[in-house]
């Protein structure tokens, strides 16, 4: 059902952060940093895939997502919703249901047999497609999905994620250069603010996470990760 209430961004961010912490999707590990496929080293990790197992949480997040999309993009400005393989697919399905729109999903690359399809589902050429994924770090994977959709004839100008790291300075710039505007519900600063307020983690962990958030590039380099933004 299309939402008829539109909470403010601050309320959405705080409640989203609380829910992510409550279901233990948030992990702080400064002593043994996480390594991402992009090459960054990080003391924080978030597992948005876990949300599919919590119906009350995911339903609330989908309501938030639909309200953000309608407010920022428009009520009649999207024709379809496409999920990125694989984590974006369930969220795209729930959002397309909320928005009463057709759904597709896009693979990272063509499957290599049969129709050799990279996109599953149907849309008319020129359709305005919203790309959906669970999260983004530096934004680069969204560009690959958007390019595949555009190659198939879609118009893609917006991408929605539940969670945006919100700390890599070039992420939004990179997306903008690719013709994409990103919408999200919360970022790591929202998580940190709630964690401090509610005392969810010990002070040492919170201090180390804050150091990372203030300077992720140097923190990554000092802990075995990449030290420059990928080209």
Swiss-Prot record:
<comment type="function">
    <text>Catalyzes the transfer of a ribosyl phosphate group from 5-phosphoribose 1-diphosphate to orotate, leading to the formation of orotidine monophosphate (OMP).</text>
</comment>
<keyword id="KW-0665">Pyrimidine biosynthesis</keyword>
<dbReference type="InterPro" id="IPR004467">
    <property type="entry name" value="Or_phspho_trans_dom"/>
</dbReference>
<dbReference type="Pfam" id="PF00156">
    <property type="entry name" value="Pribosyltran"/>
</dbReference>
<feature type="binding site" description="in other chain">
    <location>
        <begin position="133"/>
        <end position="141"/>
    </location>
    <ligand>
        <name>5-phospho-alpha-D-ribose 1-diphosphate</name>
    </ligand>
</feature>
<dbReference type="InterPro" id="IPR029057">
    <property type="entry name" value="PRTase-like"/>
</dbReference>
<protein>
    <recommendedName>
        <fullName>Orotate phosphoribosyltransferase</fullName>
        <ecNumber>2.4.2.10</ecNumber>
    </recommendedName>
</protein>
<comment type="similarity">
    <text>Belongs to the purine/pyrimidine phosphoribosyltransferase family. PyrE subfamily.</text>
</comment>
<dbReference type="GO" id="GO:0004588">
    <property type="term" value="F:orotate phosphoribosyltransferase activity"/>
</dbReference>
<dbReference type="GO" id="GO:0000287">
    <property type="term" value="F:magnesium ion binding"/>
</dbReference>
<dbReference type="InterPro" id="IPR000836">
    <property type="entry name" value="PRibTrfase_dom"/>
</dbReference>
<comment type="pathway">
    <text>Pyrimidine metabolism; UMP biosynthesis via de novo pathway; UMP from orotate: step 1/2.</text>
</comment>
<feature type="binding site">
    <location>
        <position position="107"/>
    </location>
    <ligand>
        <name>5-phospho-alpha-D-ribose 1-diphosphate</name>
    </ligand>
</feature>
<dbReference type="InterPro" id="IPR023031">
    <property type="entry name" value="OPRT"/>
</dbReference>
<feature type="binding site">
    <location>
        <position position="137"/>
    </location>
    <ligand>
        <name>orotate</name>
    </ligand>
</feature>
<keyword id="KW-0460">Magnesium</keyword>
<feature type="binding site" description="in other chain">
    <location>
        <position position="108"/>
    </location>
    <ligand>
        <name>5-phospho-alpha-D-ribose 1-diphosphate</name>
    </ligand>
</feature>
<feature type="binding site">
    <location>
        <position position="111"/>
    </location>
    <ligand>
        <name>5-phospho-alpha-D-ribose 1-diphosphate</name>
    </ligand>
</feature>
<dbReference type="GO" id="GO:0019856">
    <property type="term" value="P:pyrimidine nucleobase biosynthetic process"/>
</dbReference>
<comment type="subunit">
    <text>Homodimer.</text>
</comment>
<keyword id="KW-0808">Transferase</keyword>
<keyword id="KW-0328">Glycosyltransferase</keyword>
<dbReference type="GO" id="GO:0044205">
    <property type="term" value="P:'de novo' UMP biosynthetic process"/>
</dbReference>
């Amino acid at each position: 059902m299309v939402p008829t209430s539109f909470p403010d961004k601050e309320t959405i961010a705080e409640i989203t952060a609380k829910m992510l912490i409550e279901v233990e999707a948030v992990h702080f590990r400064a002593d043994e940093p996480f390594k991402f496929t992009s090459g960054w080293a990080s003391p924080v990790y978030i597992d948005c895939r876990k949300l599919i197992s919590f119906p009350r949480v995911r339903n609330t997040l989908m309501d938030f997502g639909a309200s953000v999309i309608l407010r920022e993009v428009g009520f009649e400005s999207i024709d379809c919703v496409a999920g990125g393989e694989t984590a974006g697919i369930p969220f795209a399905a729930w959002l397309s249901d909320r928005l009463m729109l057709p759904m597709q999903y896009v693979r990272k690359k063509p499957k290599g047999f049969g129709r050799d399809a990279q996109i599953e589902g149907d849309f008319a050429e020129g359709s305005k497609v919203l790309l959906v994924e669970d999260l983004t770090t530096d934004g680069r994977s969204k560009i690959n999905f958007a390019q595949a959709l555009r190659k198939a004839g879609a118009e893609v100008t917006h991408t929605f994620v539940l969670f945006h790291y919100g700390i890599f300075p070039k992420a939004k710039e990179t997306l903008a250069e690719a013709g994409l505007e990103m919408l999200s519900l919360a970022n790591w600063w929202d998580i940190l603010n709630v964690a401090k307020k509610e005392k969810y983690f010990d002070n040492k962990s919170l201090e180390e996470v804050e150091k990372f958030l203030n300077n992720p590039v140097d923190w990554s380099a000092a802990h075995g990760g990449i030290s420059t933004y990928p080209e």
